[in-house]
Regions:
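Bacterial N-terminal signal peptides
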Residues: 10-22
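Beta-lactamase-like hydrolase cores
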Residues: 25-70
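Structured C-terminal helix/loop/strand segments within mature extracytoplasmic catalytic/sensor domains
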Residues: 29-40, 146-147, 151, 194-225, ...
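Soluble periplasmic/extracytoplasmic beta-strand elements of cell-envelope proteins
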Residues: 49-54, 61-62, 78, 99, ...
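Active-site SXXK
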Residues: 58, 70-100, 132, 267
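Short, well-structured active-site flanking segments
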Residues: 85-105, 151-156, 206-210
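Conserved catalytic neighborhood of penicillin-recognizing serine enzymes
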Residues: 105-142, 151
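Mid-domain, small-residue-enriched loop/turn segments at the edges of structured enzyme/sensor domains
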Residues: 121, 142-201
């Protein structure tokens, strides 16, 4: 079956309209807060979705959250949760060795592991997970999908965790072969924050695997000019980025920001179909994160 961009975008909007709310909002954001976020979002010639929530109070602010956005590599965070769930269950072992053959390393895709080991080799599950999360390797991503039974497994996990508004339908290789499929791998910003919150509260993983994934995300090597771009070094950012193909279909960053006082904020920013450059999109993401951390009333309350 051939999917068109308009069809997939339409599916996203319908799915979004039918999905139930996933983030309880304790207090509505002041109008000034919403206006400030909208001003940043409207500075780009793009569709921008941003949602932030203080994890201790539930106070939230959002713009463009009625739309589902293509995740691109952000979905590797969701995949990592599914893999580590099976580690917790004993079905997988972080130290188990996985043999990768040369023909499994697709050439025309982002793959730091292939660049280092073009002939493949033997790797621990832990290392493949690290390369997938921290370096956003597309080949190791698809190997992990195959290991747990495909994208359907991840979608079932999301349902089990009570998360609606996130869709994981296609692998990296499938999106590479048909770029329009990226629109089916979608998320609303607040839905991603719901997943980040469940992860942080220990509702998905055991303590050891939760800490492992947190450390991997805190050491993310991609997108350093996005959420982290304008924050001082005393802010910890555990995050996962996502980027589109040759056209600026997606410039994303999602994660948890730990403020110097120890408070935590889940933030998800998705930029879709931008007519501006990737650096311009990244600058806006960085500005949003800085505003949230330094000027948003909910963050400054304690």
């Amino acid at each position: 079956m051939t999917f068109t961009g308009s069809f997939l975008r339409g599916c996203m909007v319908c799915s979004c309209a039918l999905s139930l709310g996933v983030m309880p909002v304790v207090a509505a954001s002041p109008a000034a807060d919403s206006a400030a976020v909208q001003k940043l979002a409207h500075s780009l010639k793009a569709r921008v979705g941003m949602a932030a929530v203080m994890l201790d109070t539930g106070e939230a602010v959002a713009v463009g959250d009625e739309t589902a956005y293509p995740m691109q590599s952000v979905f590797k965070f969701v995949l990592a949760l599914s893999v580590l769930k099976r580690v917790d269950q004993g079905a997988l072992n972080l130290e188990q060795i996985i043999h990768i053959r040369p023909e499994q390393l697709v050439k025309d895709t982002w793959s730091p592991l292939r660049e280092r080991f073009p002939q493949g080799g033997d790797f621990s599950l832990k290392e493949l997970l690290r390369v997938t999360v921290q370096e956003s390797d597309n080949n190791t991503c698809d190997l992990l999908f195959a290991l747990i039974g495909g994208t359907e497994t991840v979608q079932k996990d999301l349902k089990e965790w009570g998360i609606s508004g996130i869709n994981v339908r296609f692998t990296e290789d499938e999106m590479l072969r048909n770029h329009e499929l990226q629109y089916a791998n979608s998320s609303r910003p607040s839905a991603m924050n719901a997943l980040l919150r469940a992860f942080d509260e220990g509702k998905i993983l055991n303590k050891d695997t939760q800490r492992l994934l947190w450390d991997m995300m805190a050491g993310c090597a991609t997108g350093t000019t996005r959420l982290k771009g304008k924050l001082p070094q005393d802010y910890v950012v555990a995050h996962k980025t996502g980027s589109g193909f040759t056209v600026i279909t997606a410039v994303n960053d999602v994660g948890i920001i730990v403020l110097p006082n120890g408070r935590k904020m889940a933030v998800s920013v998705f930029v879709m179909d931008s007519k501006d450059s990737a650096p311009a999109c990244e600058k806006v993401i960085a500005s949003m994160a800085r505003w949230l951390c330094t000027e948003w009333q909910a963050a400054a309350a304690k």
